[in-house]
Amino acid sequence: MAEVDYATLKKGGFMRQKQKDNFSLRLQVVGGALTVENLKKIAEVAEKYGDGHVHLTSRQGVEIPFIKLQDIDEVKEELAKGGCKPGVCGPRVRTVTACQGNQICPSGNIDTYELAVELDKRYFGRELPHKFKFGVTGCQNNCLKAEENDVGIKGALNVKWLEDKCINCGVCEKACRTEAIKIEDGKVIVDYDKCNYCGRCAKACPTDAWDAKAAYILSFGGT
């Protein structure tokens, strides 16, 4: 019987379990998004080749445990039919995580999924001295905890007051959580040292009196 190359299997997402010749398969999931087709195939494989359940990881991943050694090649073929691929383990670029971003969330400032797909396309699985993680979050609510990733990307809005559209209603001042906005003598004053570029002022304004451009806040090193 040929010797099993456990290192190569782990590199390709198949992690050894404590049960002999059983593996938990980590799948490649980009930005936490799975289609109905993906989900159906994952359920089918988990039922046929696993023990009928999956594990949702802390980084938006999916793992199918109790895959038998002799079924590994067949499992990969079956998953491919549903648009699913094995993930990676070890010292390489891991799953790119993302919140739902501005395509769904009212607070989102950037298209997080589009960015996650691009990062995944460029870097996923790349060999490095240590495991490496990207995280993309859409706004200052920071649902994805961007700073905990080796590279964190947080959506922001660069805002500029447009005096000719302003009706001095004060909504922007009330919306600002960092007290960066003050209205003085009919003018909106922005203290950019206090501004966290959340964009709440622009989104709350009833007359579109803010020029708002998407931007990115980057963090490096993780926690």
Stretches with model-predicted labels:
Residues 14-19, 50-56, 182:
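Short, flexible, solvent-exposed loop/turn segments with mixed acidic/basic and small polar residues
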Residues 208, 221-223:
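Catalytic residues for metal-mediated phosphoryl-transfer on nucleic acids/nucleotides
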Residues 171-188, 196, 200-216:
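Iron-sulfur cluster-binding cysteine motifs and their immediate structural context
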Residues 1-41:
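N-terminal basic/disordered segments at the start of proteins
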Residues 25-159, 165-167:
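Small-residue-enriched alpha-helical segments and adjacent helix-cap loops
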Residues 2-11, 33, 134, 144-156, ...:
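Conserved alpha/beta core surface patches that mediate binding of polyanionic ligands
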Residues 147, 218-219:
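Long insertion/accessory domains within large nucleic-acid-processing enzymes
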Residues 94-97, 134, 161-174, 190-203:
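Cys/His-enriched microdomains
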